[in-house]
Amino acid sequence: DPNATIIMLGTGTGIAPFR
């Protein structure tokens, strides 16, 4: 799931852009 990478980036920035 490519979203997994975005989720990792989201947690690092404190947001969830995958939404």
From Swiss-Prot:
Protein's membrane topology: Peripheral membrane protein
GO biological process terms on file: photosynthesis
Annotated binding of NADP(+), by residue: 13
Entry keyword annotation includes Oxidoreductase: yes
UniProt pathway annotation: Energy metabolism; photosynthesis
Top-level taxonomic group: Eukaryota
Gene Ontology MF terms: ferredoxin-NADP+ reductase activity
Keyword set, alphabetical order: Chloroplast, Electron transport, FAD, Flavoprotein, Membrane, NADP, Oxidoreductase, Photosynthesis, Plastid, Thylakoid, Transport
The protein's required cofactors: FAD
EC number(s) reported in the record: 1.18.1.2
Binding residues for FAD: 13
Known catalytic reactions: 2 reduced [2Fe-2S]-[ferredoxin] + NADP(+) + H(+) = 2 oxidized [2Fe-2S]-[ferredoxin] + NADPH
GO cellular component: a single term: chloroplast stroma
Assigned protein family: Belongs to the ferredoxin--NADP reductase type 1 family.
Biological function: May play a key role in regulating the relative amounts of cyclic and non-cyclic electron flow to meet the demands of the plant for ATP and reducing power.
Protein name, UniProt field: Ferredoxin--NADP reductase, chloroplastic
Organism of this sequence: Populus euphratica (Euphrates poplar)
